[in-house]
Regions:
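N-terminal beta-strand motif that seeds the catalytic metal site of vicinal oxygen chelate
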Residues: 1-16, 46, 60-62, 108-143, ...
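Structured core of small recognition/catalytic domains
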Residues: 146, 155-204, 208-214
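Fold-core signature of tandem repeat domains
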Residues: 5-8, 21, 26-30, 40, ...
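Core segments of cupin and vicinal oxygen chelate
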Residues: 1-47, 78, 133-171
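Vicinal oxygen chelate
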Residues: 4-13, 53-137, 155, 199, ...
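A charge-rich, low-complexity, intrinsically flexible signal that marks solvent-exposed coils, linkers
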Residues: 52, 178, 239-240
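Short acidic/glycine-enriched loop/turn segments that link adjacent beta-strands
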Residues: 34-37, 56-58, 90-95, 158-161, ...
């Protein structure tokens, strides 16, 4: 069984502008957890948080729930990654760490007591966050790295973009691949009813369009925005077959 993606975070040197941006863009419920961190309740998929960046650099990351974060950090380093944030205890119920993969993309690790913030499902409102995406420089290398690290398997599809099956039965699905346009990120996507409308709304709220709308196939459109801090956040719309 693979490890599930269960949480996301957004950070900035000044996190305050991010709160109204995401609340108004997606209709999410925000609840302050501390002076520097606000919990985001979405309308489905996984929840997340908005916090102050210790380094001052903006960042977006999703977290993978693992049995042993330190062992996973060690494994990531042996596969060509680097520790970005060492194992940190948030409370008696939660520890986390972060690493960068061979492309320098940042991904989080977490270990939580079942039902205590580790992907039990969203109870908020607004757009669901139900997809993650890793775009590196070499699809085969990225797929091998994450497959080995988290036990993920990939659907037999376009070799430049593998659909992830974590096999965990919780968390969200995603894709690992590479872009011919030079796009590099590890981020999450919100499901919306109209990609163009949300891209335009983001621009009106102080963000900018990263790409889109892009017709992925006959049933799906995608796009991405850069928030006021410069973080890339994806959006998509899927029409049922």
């Amino acid at each position: 069984m693979g490890d599930p993606v269960t949480w996301f975070d957004l950070g900035a040197a000044d996190e305050e502008p991010l709160k109204p941006f995401y609340a108004e863009l997606f209709g999410w419920t925000l609840q302050p957890a501390s002076e520097r961190y606000t919990v985001v309740a979405t309308g489905g998929g996984i929840n997340g948080g908005i916090g102050r960046s210790r380094s001052g650099d903006p960042w977006v990351a999703f977290y993978v729930d693992v049995a042993d974060p330190q062992a996973t950090l060690d494994a990531a380093e042996s596969l060509g990654g680097k520790t970005a944030v060492p194992l940190t205890k948030v409370s008696d119920m939660l520890t986390f760490a972060m690493f960068t993969d061979p492309d320098g993309l940042i991904v989080g690790l977490t270990k939580a007591i079942e039902g205590e913030g580790n992907g039990g499902g969203s109870v908020g409102q607004g757009a669901p966050v139900d997809w993650f995406e890793i775009l590196g420089s070499d699809a085969k290398r990225s797929q091998a790295f994450y497959g080995e690290l988290f036990g993920w398997t990939y659907a037999d599809a376009d070799p430049s973009y593998g659909l992830v099956d974590t096999g965990a039965g919780r968390g969200i699905g995603g894709g690992v691949g590479a872009s011919g346009q030079g796009m590099r990120w590890a981020t999450v996507y919100a499901s919306v009813e109209d990609v163009e409308r949300y891209l335009a709304r983001a621009e009106g709220l102080g963000g900018r369009r990263e790409y889109g709308p892009l017709d992925v196939d006959d049933h799906m459109q995608s796009g991405a925005v850069r928030d006021p801090a410069g973080n890339v956040f994806g959006i998509y719309h899927h029409e049922p077959h």
